[in-house]
Design a protein with these regions (language model features):
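Nucleotide-activated donor-dependent transferases that construct or modify glycoconjugates
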Residues: 2-12, 305-306
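Donor-nucleotide binding loops and adjacent catalytic segments primarily
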Residues: 39, 47, 183-274
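A donor-sugar binding/catalytic signature common to diverse glycosyltransferases
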Residues: 94-95, 101, 116-117, 144, ...
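A short beta-strand-loop structural module common to alpha/beta enzyme folds
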Residues: 32-40
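A nucleotide-sugar donor-handling region in carbohydrate enzymes
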Residues: 39-44, 63, 140-213
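N-terminal beta-loop-helix "entrance" segment that forms/cooperates
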Residues: 40-56
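Active-site and donor-binding regions of nucleotide-sugar-utilizing enzymes
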Residues: 7-10, 16-22, 29, 49, ...
Length: 331
C-alpha cells in the first residue's frame, strides 16, 4: 500500500524548531516532501537548527526572498503552487503564522487538503502582520490544530466548523524533552564568561519593535535603563535585521548590553534556564518558560510586546506581558 504524500512547508526558525519532532515522525508514516521557502536565509537562523535538532535537509528550497515583502510573499505563493502542481501532494502541513504559511493559498486553489498546526492564535492587534496571516490561513484550512482551548474558542466564535477544529497542544514540549540532556550539557556559559543568574538574556526582532522608529527607541531606551538599574550583563541574541537597524539608527547601547549572533537551540535554551531574566519578543518564549518551569528550571519570562496570542501562558503565571516602555519592562 502506497503511503500518502505529505508536503510540509517551513521557512523560519520557530517553524523548524516546533515541527522538528513532527517532521521525523512524518518521514516514517508518510511519503513526506519537506520544503523550505528560504524566508530566513541566514545560517544562524536556519541551518544551525537543522544540525542541532538532527533534521534531514529539505527536499526543495524555494529561494523565495525577493527585493521587498510583496515580492517575497508573491514568490512563496507562486513557487509553492508550481511545486505542488509538479509533486501532486495528497495534503499540506504548515505551522504558525509566518509568510511561509501563505503557501496554503496555493494549496487551496489546487484543492489540496490543508492541515494547520498552531491554529486559532489571536492577539487582536490588527497592526501585526502575523495576525493577518493567522486569519487567512485558519479560514482556508481543512483541519485546524490548536494549542489551547482559548484558540479553539476563538475559531469557533469566528464561525469555523467545530468538526474541523481540534486541540492538540504544542509540539514544543516533545522537542524540549527530547533535547533536555543536550540543553543541560551545553557549555555556553563558560564559553561566554557568564555566571548563572547573573545576566539577562535579550531577544528582540519583531517587525513592530524594530521597524517602527518610536517603538524601536522606546524599547532600546528601556533596555539601556534595565542594564543601568540591575548592573549586570545583558546578552542580546541579535537577529541580522535587528543589527542592521541598530547600525542604521546609530543607537548607542549601554556597554553592559552585549550583542551576539543568534545562538543555536541547545545554547540558547541553556542560557534561558540559567538567566536572571529573559526579556524577549520571541514566539517560542511562552512554551519555553512553561516547559522549563515544569522540569525545575524556572526563569522569569518578560515579553516585550503589547499583546500576546498565547493567553494560556499568562494563565500559568510563568510569563509576563511587559510592553516596551521603560516603566513596564523594568517593573
Amino acid at each position: 500500500m502506497n503511503k500518502l504524500k505529505l508536503m510540509t512547508i517551513i521557512g523560519t526558525r520557530p517553524e523548524i524548531i516546533r515541527l522538528s519532532a513532527v517532521i521525523k515522525k512524518c518521514d516514517v508514516y508518510f511519503d513526506q516532501i519537506l520544503v523550505h521557502t528560504g524566508q530566513n536565509y541566514d545560517y544562524n537562523l536556519n541551518q544551525v537548527f537543522f544540525e542541532d535538532l538532527g533534521l534531514r535537509a529539505p527536499d526543495f528550497y524555494l529561494d523565495a526572498v525577493g527585493k521587498d515583502l510583496g515580492e517575497t510573499i508573491g514568490n512563496i505563493i507562486a513557487k509553492s503552487y508550481s511545486l505542488m502542481v509538479e509533486q501532486k501532494p495528497d495534503a499540506l502541513l504548515i505551522l504558525g503564522d509566518t509568510n511561509s504559511c501563505l503557501s496554503a493559498i496555493a494549496a487551496k486553489r489546487l484543492h489540496i487538503p490543508i492541515f494547520h498546526m498552531e491554529a486559532g492564535n489571536r492577539c487582536f492587534d490588527e497592526c501585526l502582520p502575523e495576525e493577518t496571516n493567522r486569519r487567512i490561513v485558519d479560514h482556508i484550512s481543512d483541519v485546524n490544530m490548536c494549542y489551547s482551548e482559548h484558540a479553539r474558542r476563538y475559531l469557533n466564535a469566528e464561525g469555523t466548523a467545530k468538526e474541523r477544529t481540534f486541540v492538540t497542544g504544542s509540539p514544543m514540549a516533545e522537542v524540549l524533552h527530547a533535547n533536555l540532556a543536550k540543553i543541560e550539557a551545553s557549555d555556553v556559559l563558560e564559553r561566554l564568561g557568564l555566571e548563572p543568574h547573573k545576566y539577562m538574556l535579550l531577544s528582540a526582532h519583531r517587525e513592530e519593535n524594530i521597524d517602527t522608529e518610536k517603538n524601536f527607541i522606546d524599547l532600546f531606551t528601556s533596555i539601556n535603563h534595565l542594564a543601568q538599574t540591575y548592573d549586570m550583563p545583558i546578552l542580546y541574541s541579535c537577529h541580522p535585521r535587528s543589527k542592521k537597524r541598530l547600525d542604521a539608527m546609530g543607537f548607542q547601547l549601554d556597554e553592559r548590553v552585549k550583542l551576539h549572533e543568534p545562538l543555536g537551540f541547545h545554547d540558547y535554551n541553556h542560557l534561558q534556564m540559567n538567566a536572571f531574566a529573559v526579556v524577549s519578543d520571541s514566539g517560542t518564549l511562552p512554551e519555553e518558560s512553561s516547559f522549563f518551569t515544569s522540569v525545575g528550571h524556572p526563569f522569569p519570562a518578560v515579553c516585550i510586546r503589547t499583546s500576546t496570542e498565547r493567553p494560556e501562558a499568562l494563565d500559568k503565571g510563568c510569563f509576563v506581558l511587559a510592553g516596551i516602555s521603560e516603566g513596564g519592562v523594568e517593573q
